[in-house]
């Protein structure tokens, strides 16, 4: 990956497009603790451990604790974004589209979830406005639900009956559930989750044969799955 990205950057310089190219580089989910053992309790890759602070984020890919959601996010735009700067702005993937739209002057469709982070990237003085903030961030995945507001995070694991609440400013590892001592905070975050939830609508799911093909490809099988069998119709004949 490093070599191929380097080749892209080098080509941009050769074509004199380097300072006209805004690049986003990110992971898609938290790490997975592959090959766990007594010697490597978090797996050989030490999934979701902050190398600078030593904080071990709870969870992994596929769950909605911090370890499943925190990802690297790097933005590059030579001549526009100052290098070697670290931001603590809270954002997520839907922010990429409006950021690109603002940078290019494109018109955005209505009703999108993201906000532009261009002021955070360029500096508010260069962008000509202050950076807006999300009221909250919301996730749903395989029965899990989570919502974050500031440093508060409420999580409801799959099949759980009760919500959990964590103060990430004091407990980034999410080791102490403080729901019982902060009922009003939890109530507020659950209300946000209820506001954000959209029930599944009939007829909007995708074709299952595509997912079956992807699943088989992960196992090294690149053949086409068998098409679904057609159901026989009952035909009534008159005697």
What is each of the regions a protein language model found here?
Residues 96, 150, 154, 160-162, ...:
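Long, internal low-complexity/basic segments
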Residues 1-38:
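Metal-dependent active-site segment of extracytoplasmic phospho-/sulfohydrolases and closely related
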Residues 5, 12, 22-27, 72-73, ...:
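Beta-strand elements within well-structured catalytic alpha/beta cores of enzymes
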Residues 17-23, 70-71, 133-134, 149-152, ...:
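Loop/turn elements at helix/coil->beta-strand transitions in domains of secreted/extracellular proteins
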Residues 73-75, 91:
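Short glycine- and hydrophobic/aromatic-rich loop-to-beta-strand nucleating segment
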Residues 33-64, 81-85, 89-168, 199-200, ...:
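C-terminal cap/loop subdomain of S1 sulfatases and analogous C-terminal strand-loop tails that border
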Residues 6, 10-17, 101-105, 122, ...:
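Sec-exported extracytoplasmic/periplasmic mature domains
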Residues 3-7, 16, 52, 95, ...:
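Extracytoplasmic/secreted proteins, especially bacterial periplasmic and envelope-associated proteins
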């Amino acid at each position: 990956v490093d070599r191929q990205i380097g080749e892209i950057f080098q080509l941009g310089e050769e074509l004199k497009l380097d300072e006209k190219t805004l690049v986003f580089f990110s992971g898609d989910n938290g790490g997975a603790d592959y090959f766990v053992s007594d010697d490597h309790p978090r797996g050989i890759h030490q999934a979701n451990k902050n190398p600078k602070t030593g904080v071990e984020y709870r969870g992994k890919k596929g769950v909605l604790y911090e370890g499943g959601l925190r990802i690297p996010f790097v933005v590059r735009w030579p001549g526009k974004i100052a290098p070697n700067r670290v931001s603590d702005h809270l954002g997520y993937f839907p922010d990429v589209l409006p950021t690109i739209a603002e940078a290019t002057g494109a018109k955005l469709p209505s009703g999108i979830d993201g906000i532009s982070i261009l002021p955070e990237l360029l500096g508010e003085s260069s962008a000509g406005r202050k950076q807006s903030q999300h009221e909250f961030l919301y996730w749903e995945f395989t029965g899990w639900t989570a919502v974050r507001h500031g440093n508060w995070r409420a999580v409801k694991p799959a099949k759980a009956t009760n919500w959990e609440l964590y103060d990430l400013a004091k407990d980034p590892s999410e080791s102490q559930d403080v729901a019982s001592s902060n009922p009003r905070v939890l109530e507020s975050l659950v209300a946000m989750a209820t506001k954000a939830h959209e029930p599944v609508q009939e007829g909007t799911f995708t074709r299952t044969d595509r997912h079956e093909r992807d699943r088989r490809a992960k196992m090294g099988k690149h053949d086409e799955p068998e098409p679904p069998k057609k159901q026989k119709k009952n035909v009534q004949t008159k005697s």
